[in-house]
């Protein structure tokens, strides 16, 4: 259709340029211009200067005709073509709507459960923004509402072990509320928050025991503080033991997925196609390898927490009393090292153990000391680090500062960190 329109324009332009009307108009205009000067247009006397000026003006007129006529006619012809012909898409709007309705199953899942996902901010009460005067954001994460009266589920590492801070929750509609930490299980990395609001949208909890490898799942949350973010993928494994991930004191078979779980996504829901939470987003090792806590394990935590609340006390296990460094880490097991080396050429071939830093809290001692996500800790105070337990032992030591040897890509570096007392 566009080619037909261009062909019509070309034909009309040629006819216009060859038209005697335009030439006669140009001649008449030339005569009138010479007449204004008081010169006979047919005179051949000593009027060379005027004749030269006339020829110059004639050339200028022709330039104007050649320049403006095609554009004017082009606009007119284009308008005529638009009136006569429809620029319809290849697929009719009604059919497109039907296909979108039939095949956009991810959008259907999100529409049914996104209202129950919240954005969590950890505010540093010691440092304030210069312009607004409000406490700066030290960290962020995600969570989801599990009771209409304001009970929210998230990861423990999102909200605890951060001194001099307060927790704020932003709902999907933009409203923000202060939150209190109610229940904590640091061993399983689960926690609940409470905000003083009622009649909230609640996330339905599914059954992780019925999951199969290859099932579609959707991860919702706030990666890198970008709230209301949706990523999708499949379940890569339903039985990834915590021992394979080097996580101490945890007897959990994690859900492995290739749905992107990035910093800030922690604590958000991993949802099946029925819109039910079947896991809590927990950690990412590298692109395409992320892990979530199975919802069946979460239900046990919630039941114990509810029993404690009925008795008038909060459910807190493994609550930290150690010094604070401000990182989230993962032990580099042989399986994880193999995956990292296969996906990155910057991993040293002789690296056999260490701890991967996959999140650094802004404003924390680790952040001030220069640690970055992706660094691999190999030594602390000249002691070899083989797993995350060694890092906890170093924090429990009485040393005022920690001299940490890290690998950043293929480069070995030293950073010095002064942990904060609890």
From Swiss-Prot:
The chain crosses the membrane at residues 64-82. It comes from the Eukaryota. A motif (IAP-binding) lies at residues 75-78, 94-97. Residues 139-302 are annotated as: Serine protease. Residues 18-74 form a propeptide. It catalyses: Cleavage of non-polar aliphatic amino-acids at the P1 position, with a preference for Val, Ile and Met. At the P2 and P3 positions, Arg is selected most strongly with a secondary preference for other hydrophilic residues. One of its GO terms (molecular function) is serine-type endopeptidase activity. It is found in: Mitochondrion intermembrane space; Mitochondrion membrane. PROSITE patterns: PDZ. Keywords: Apoptosis, Hydrolase, Membrane, Mitochondrion, Protease, Serine protease, Transit peptide, Transmembrane, Transmembrane helix, Zymogen. Residues 33-55 are annotated as: Disordered. Residues 325-410 form the PDZ domain. The keyword Cell membrane does not apply. InterPro entries: PDZ, PDZ_6, PDZ_sf, Peptidase_S1_PA, Peptidase_S1C. The active site is at residues 157, 189, 266. Residues 42-53 have a biased composition (Low complexity). Residues 1-17 form a transit peptide. GO terms for cellular component: cytosol; mitochondrial intermembrane space; mitochondrial membrane; Nebenkern. Serine protease that shows proteolytic activity against a non-specific substrate beta-casein. Promotes or induces cell death either by direct binding to and inhibition of BIRC proteins (also called inhibitor of apoptosis proteins, IAPs), leading to an increase in caspase activity, or by a BIRC inhibition-independent, caspase-independent and serine protease activity-dependent mechanism. Can antagonize antiapoptotic activity of th/Diap1 by directly inducing the degradation of th/Diap1. Belongs to the peptidase S1C family. This is Serine protease HTRA2, mitochondrial. It comes from Drosophila simulans (Fruit fly). The lineage of its organism: Eukaryota, Metazoa, Ecdysozoa, Arthropoda, Hexapoda.
